[in-house]
From Swiss-Prot:
Belongs to the class I-like SAM-binding methyltransferase superfamily. Trm1 family. GO terms for molecular function: tRNA (guanine(26)-N2)-dimethyltransferase activity; tRNA binding. InterPro entries: SAM-dependent_MTases_sf (IPR029063), Trm1 (IPR002905), TRM1_arc_bac (IPR022923), tRNA_met_Trm1_C (IPR042296). This is tRNA (guanine(26)-N(2))-dimethyltransferase. Zn(2+) binds at C237, C240, C256, C259. Dimethylates a single guanine residue at position 26 of a number of tRNAs using S-adenosyl-L-methionine as donor of the methyl groups. Residues 4-368 form the Trm1 methyltransferase domain. Signal peptide: none annotated. Coiled coil: none annotated. The lineage of its organism: Archaea, Methanobacteriati, Methanobacteriota, Stenosarchaea group, Methanomicrobia.
């Protein structure tokens, strides 16, 4: 296999050579490696340096970069698995070159996770993680991390695929990135609570072409019930920007108070908070001591997530301004005015124009229009 040496964080490793002239170079190598996911891996290394689980499974390792970095930079016991024999050979080569004591296994991830337990289980497949979440929920002791790159089904752009994979009806709204993250979270929670286990989000975010969950698992039916209580729906008006939130297994019919249209249920999805502030604060404190090529971006993301409201949807500031036919001013000014009126308001990490508030839509529109 033709390989090249790459560095991420403090780890040097070999990856399969790719054709840079193709539209998607990672798919051209004999073993998959996507350099665009470096931020995802940097964040994982940072979080694990705070959590320090007793063992860690990189269930779909490919070249092994995620597991290699965890073993080398965090120093915890790591197992790297892949079904591709060439990937396993490359991962073993990387383990040996780094002088690591790490286990590399060859086989189906579901079979491995069905037979063994790990303190932290990490799912980072190509595409949807849906076929692996059930076995991961049984294998993970305290932590479950999940990446999804099938953003179109999760966000409602490919509706039928989203319904098949996640048993949810996402909707392609102006807050579609948050719909995708919460749809993924809702699916994972429903898979976990079957086993009388609860879920607590630690650090969950959407970025470019992926959604990422870092979750703490709790034991007991009471913990499962607490998680179940946060499954629900965003009820979206098809005619205007009004939306409301409902919790429960089935949505109740609801009418838009602004235009009388029947609200459309989006979900089921997770309606609760998506981050734990103490965890984010610990990550911020640890960031200077971690070598991360995307450290500046992670720092900005953590800062935004810490002040982001826990409402289940956000508004796109520019969409509101366009509907009102006004020129959008500074988003910070809108937030300041909402807070001055007694409402909560913040930016959201999903985009530069994402705004969260508990103010009624007419109040928000009045503030945006300068009234």
């Amino acid at each position: 296999m033709d390989v090249v040496e790459v560095t991420e964080g403090r780890t040097r490793f070999f990856v399969s050579r790719q054709d840079p002239h193709l539209q998607f170079p990672p798919g051209s190598g004999q073993v998959f490696y996507n350099s665009r996911m470096e931020m995802n891996r940097d964040a994982t290394v940072l979080l694990l340096s705070v959590l320090r689980p007793e063992s860690y499974l990189d269930a779909m390792g490919a070249s092994g970069v995620r597991g290699l970095r965890v073993a080398h930079e965090v120093g915890i016991p790591v197992t790297i698995n892949d079904w591709n024999a060439k990937a396993v050979d490359l991962a073993r080569q990387n383990v040996e070159a780094l002088g690591l004591v790490a286990e590399v296994t060859h086989g189906d991830a579901n079979v491995l996770m069905s037979g063994r337990t790990f303190d932290a289980v990490d799912l980072d497949p190509f595409g949807t993680p849906a076929p692996f979440v059930d076995s991961a929920a049984r294998s993970a002791g305290n932590y479950l991390f999940v990446t999804a790159t099938d953003t179109a089904p999760l966000c409602g752009a490919h509706l039928k695929a989203g319904m098949r994979r996640y048993f949810s009806r996402p909707r392609n709204t102006e807050y579609h990135a948050e719909v995708g993250l919460r749809t993924l979270m809702g699916f994972v929670v429903r898979e976990v609570i079957k086993y009388d286990r609860g879920v607590e989000p630690l650090f969950c975010y959407a970025h470019e072409h992926f959604h990422r969950l870092h979750l703490r698992l709790r034991y007991g039916a009471a913990a499962a019930d607490r998680a179940l209580a946060r499954i629900g729906y965003v009820m979206q008006c098809p005619n205007c920007l009004y939306r409301s939130e409902q919790t429960g297994m089935l949505p109740e019919p609801e009418e838009c108070p602004l235009c009388s249209a029947a609200l459309v249920p989006v979900g089921p999805l997770w309606t609760g908070g998506i981050n734990d502030d103490a965890t984010l604060a610990a990550m911020q404190e640890a960031l200077p001591s971690v070598t991360a090529g995307t450290g500046a971006r992670i720092g900005r993301l953590l800062a935004t997530c810490r002040q982001e409201l826990d409402t289940s949807s956000h508004y796109d500031y520019h969409v509101i301004a366009k509907r009102l036919r006004v020129s959008p001013g500074r988003i910070e000014t809108v937030i300041e005015r909402l807070v001055a009126l007694g409402y909560r308001a913040s930016r959201a990490h999903y985009s530069g124009t994402a705004l969260k508030t508990d103010a009624p839509l007419p109040v928000l529109e009045k503030v945006v229009s300068g009234g």
